[in-house]
Structures are given as structure tokens and as C-alpha cells.
């Protein structure tokens, strides 16, 4: 699973979700992509499940790019623990996504294959997404 090798601080605050995605809003590497329509957290397990779903559907054809990285730690306190006594230990890693963010890109496959593969991957996520094509930018 994806996680940072080293971070400056082990624990992070929850943060804010307001606004649209600042970067990665266009398909830059492949021909087709999956773009978010909602904001939320995507865990490293969800990213891995999407990657496996895309690769299994495309088999050896095409190339896949993952455009998100889980760089935020989420903490959790043990079960049946009373409130207080500090923040819990880091439990898993998430990527913060806002509307407009490209999550995955694929290339060297037909539009139908890319659409099916990305639809299967979208089923693994807890947020709404859409299929987008590459547009030429000046």
C-alpha cells in the first residue's frame, strides 16, 4: 500500500475540505481519466483496490497512472477507551481530494475498455466520479 517514507510530524489535524482542486485537474499523461465530483478522503487501501481492478480488467494492455498519493495520517484510539488521554496512534493513510481532481489515467486502450476499467475502479471509492477525455491545452 502507498504511504510516505517519512513525514515531519506523525499526527495531523483533520483540516478543511472547502474549494476545488488546485492541481491535477486535467488529463496530462494518458488519454482518458477519472475525475472526482465530490470532496473526501481516499484511503491507501481504496487506491490499491482501484489499481488492481483497472489492471485486472485491462490485463497486459495499456498503461495506468495513479495521480493521487495518501500523505495524510489518520489516527485512531483503541476500542473501549475512555475519552481524553491524548490523540490516538496513526492508523492509516488517506489522500484528501476535492472536486475536479484526476485520480487515475489510462492510455493505449480503446475508449470502451478505458470506460469499463475506470467504472470498475470507481465502484471501489466512496465518492462520485466521472470519465473524462484528454483535451489539448494551449
From Swiss-Prot:
Protein name as annotated: Large ribosomal subunit protein uL16
Chain's role: Binds 23S rRNA and is also seen to make contacts with the A and possibly P site tRNAs.
HAMAP family: Ribosomal_uL16 (MF_01342)
GO cellular component: cytosolic large ribosomal subunit
Recorded name of the encoding gene: rplP
One Pfam assignment: Ribosomal_L16
CDD domains in the record: Ribosomal_L16_L10e (cd01433)
Record bears the keyword Transferase: no
Record's subunit section: Part of the 50S ribosomal subunit.
Species of origin: Chlamydia trachomatis serovar L2 (strain ATCC VR-902B / DSM 19102 / 434/Bu)
